[in-house]
């Protein structure tokens, strides 16, 4: 809304939003039986469909594309799950390099609080339960999210992430993101 009020047409993309794969991916995840490679390929298909049918056409039409998570989240998840780094990079080599990446950094402990406030439960996959880190979903969530944070820390150097402290009010966070976004757009 903020960008559109400033005259920029926008399109939003994110995980599990493609017409081709999102519903099947959600159904497959509900059974908690996917192996790491199949899960990765499902998400890669979801991304590729959005790239071809939403991202590229929107950019060609002059839109600003806003991605709520992009390939870096998918790559980090795959790497934490033990997939080969070269394979993962090749899988997502079709992706366009974004003009900016804002990494909203929050400790796993704070993240779990926000997750409970929003969803009132923990998700099997977001908790890394498939990795066998702990039989306790809470402990597994914290360990898995810490591994993701460590992976993002390693990736940010290669992909030039702008780190944003997510442990602030919604208004403060929005103001900071707007400030960073203005620098990119102008």
Regions found by a protein language model. Give the residues of each.
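NTP-dependent small-molecule kinase module
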Residues: 2, 116-186
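ATP-dependent small-molecule kinase phosphotransfer cores
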Residues: 6-96
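Structural signal for short hydrophobic segments within the conserved structured cores
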Residues: 11, 100, 162-164
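Conserved nucleotide-binding/hydrolysis micro-motifs of P-loop NTPases
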Residues: 17-19, 71-72, 106-112, 170
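A glycine- and Lys/Arg-enriched "phosphate-lid" helix/loop adjacent to the NTP-binding pocket
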Residues: 74-147
């Amino acid at each position: 809304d903020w960008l559109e009020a400033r005259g920029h047409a926008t399109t939003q993309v994110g995980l599990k939003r493609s017409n081709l794969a999102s519903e099947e991916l959600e159904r497959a995840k509900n059974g908690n039986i996917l192996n790491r490679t199949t899960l990765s390929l499902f998400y890669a298909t979801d991304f590729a469909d959005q790239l071809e049918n939403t991202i590229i056409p929107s950019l060609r039409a002059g839109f600003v594309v806003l991605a709520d998570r992009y390939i870096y989240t998918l790559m980090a998840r795959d790497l934490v799950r033990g997939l080969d780094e070269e394979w993962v990079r090749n899988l997502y080599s079709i992706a366009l390099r974004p003009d900016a990446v804002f990494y909203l950094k929050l400790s796993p402990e704070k993240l779990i609080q926000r997750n409970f406030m929003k969803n009132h439960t923990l998700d099997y996959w977001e908790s890394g339960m498939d990795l066998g880190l702990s039989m306790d979903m809470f402990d597994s969530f914290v360990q898995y999210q810490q591994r993701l944070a460590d992976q993002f820390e390693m990736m940010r150097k290669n992909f030039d992430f702008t780190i944003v402290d997510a442990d602030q009010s919604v208004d403060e966070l929005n103001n900071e993101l707007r400030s960073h976004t203005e620098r990119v757009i102008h």
